[in-house]
Regions:
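Feature for soluble, non-membrane regions of globular proteins
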Residues: 1-100
Length: 100
């Protein structure tokens, strides 16, 4: 629930976030799209080169397609993301930060 609340705070809900993520994948042609938890506990969606060091703690790391894809293909890719894994990673990072 904490991860869902963070998505809501930062993106306006999971459906809105999925639309933003699809748009980022479409525009990032051949790069990486990261969902990162920053030091101030905000979530950032970052488009970066494959070899670049990520900012923040990465919760989700997707390779954007090298060629433009249809909206349907990108939406399908987003629908199969394991959000439970992202939520577990979010909880782990927060717990590690608050016990240090």
């Amino acid at each position: 629930k904490a991860f869902e609340a963070a998505i809501l705070r930062n993106f306006g809900g999971l459906e809105d976030f999925e639309r933003v993520l699809i748009h980022a994948l479409r525009r990032s042609c051949g790069q990486r799209v990261l969902l990162s938890l920053m030091a101030d506990d905000t979530l950032w969606l970052i488009c970066t080169r494959a070899e670049a060091d990520p900012l923040g703690a990465v919760l989700l790391d997707l390779a954007a397609p090298a060629a433009p894809c249809t909206e349907e293909a990108l939406a399908l890719r987003v629908r199969v993301i394991d959000w439970r894994h992202c939520a577990r990673r979010y909880e782990e990072v927060l717990a590690a930060r608050h016990t240090s």
